[in-house]
């Protein structure tokens, strides 16, 4: 799959121009923002020292003409801390009449992710809305900078 191969251009092409993406770190509107997120994440994952930690497993893929769902487990180094993460994700999708992704919602345990990605701060504060807001704010800022770089 494009995701397993870290191919953000193909991933972005799967989304409708006005698609929406939401997870614990991002809330995005439009193919440009969503594609930018995938480019940013794939670029970080492909860096020397990080690429050998990347692994994606997926299962439970179900879809019809209007909606779908998938379960995946992503193994990677979190670029901000260099810590190993094993994120367990359940995604739901809706599709446009021409088969593009209209909405994409990923759900995962933020506290579990924070413990792995951030270490002690995530363990102590991963349950708190304030840490989640901080992570979302940082992710949005990083994406804005990444998109500005072209």
PLM regions: where:
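Tryptophan-centric aromatic hotspots in well-structured domains and transmembrane helices
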Residues: 3, 38, 70-72
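Short, low-complexity N-terminal intrinsically disordered segments enriched in polar/charged residues
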Residues: 1-13, 17, 140-150
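Short, charged low-complexity linear motifs
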Residues: 1-2, 24, 58, 89
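A solvent-exposed, acidic/Ser-Thr-rich amphipathic alpha-helical stretch
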Residues: 8-68
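A beta-strand edge to alpha-helix "cap/lid" segment located at domain peripheries
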Residues: 44-150
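General structural signal for secondary-structure boundaries
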Residues: 3-4, 30, 120
């Amino acid at each position: 799959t494009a995701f397993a191969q870290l191919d953000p251009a193909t991933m972005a092409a799967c989304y409708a121009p006005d698609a929406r993406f939401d997870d614990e770190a991002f809330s995005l509107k439009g193919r440009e923002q969503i594609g930018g997120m995938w480019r940013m994440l794939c670029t970080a994952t492909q860096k020397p020292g990080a690429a050998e930690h990347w692994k994606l497993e997926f299962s439970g893929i179900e879809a019809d003409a209007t909606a779908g769902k998938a379960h995946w487990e992503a193994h990677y180094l979190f670029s901000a801390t260099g810590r190993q993460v094993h994120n367990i994700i359940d995604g739901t999708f809706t599709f446009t009449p021409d088969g593009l992704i209209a909405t994409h919602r990923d759900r995962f345990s933020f506290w579990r992710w924070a413990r792995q990605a951030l270490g002690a701060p995530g363990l102590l504060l991963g349950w708190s809305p304030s840490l989640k807001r901080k992570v979302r704010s940082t992710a949005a800022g990083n994406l804005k900078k990444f998109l500005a770089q072209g």
